């Protein structure tokens, strides 16, 4: 039931979630079960500024684009349960998920675009594609040291 406060300026819209388990098998992390109410709680689907939330936008966008596999950082593992709930609520089949370890620098701080941690320009000028893949695979814990590796060899790794 819509809240009488939904039309107030600056009001965010939350989706009330049931006390329900969402189970899925992550390609990297294996079987997962998340209780929406306990682990996530109700979550915003429309922000106070009127923009749609990331959770809703990514589900609708991926569903309409026919995305069947999603790979992202393991810091977003819990949000997979929210998204699976949204997929089902909207009548879409959820994709398969693979959550990989975050890529961190030597101090253990996550590399991010927001912090301008590393630029593609720098990588192109200073490394071969195989070196970049090797560095990324090593930082993600996929190979023991940052040696150059081809994309085909990387895809053959058993994670």
Predicted regions and their residues:
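Conserved catalytic-core subdomain
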Residues: 107-159
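Active-site cores that bind ATP or allylic diphosphates and position pyrophosphate for catalysis
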Residues: 1-112, 119-123, 144
């Amino acid at each position: 039931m819509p809240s009488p406060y939904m039309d107030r300026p600056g009001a965010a819209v939350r989706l009330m979630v049931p006390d329900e388990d969402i189970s899925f098998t992550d390609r990297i992390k294996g079987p997962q079960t998340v209780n929406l109410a306990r682990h996530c709680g109700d979550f915003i689907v429309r922000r106070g500024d009127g923009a749609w939330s990331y959770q809703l936008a990514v589900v609708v966008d991926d569903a309409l684009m026919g995305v069947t596999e999603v790979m992202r950082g393991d810091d977003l593992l819990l949000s997979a349960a929210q998204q699976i709930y949204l997929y089902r609520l909207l009548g879409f089949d959820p994709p398969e998920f693979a959550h990989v370890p975050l890529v961190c620098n030597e101090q253990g701080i996550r590399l991010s675009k927001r912090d301008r941690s590393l630029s593609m320009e720098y990588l192109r000028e200073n490394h071969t594609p195989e070196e970049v893949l090797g560095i990324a695979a090593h930082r993600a814990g996929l190979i023991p040291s940052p040696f150059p590796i081809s994309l085909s060899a990387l895809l053959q790794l058993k994670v």
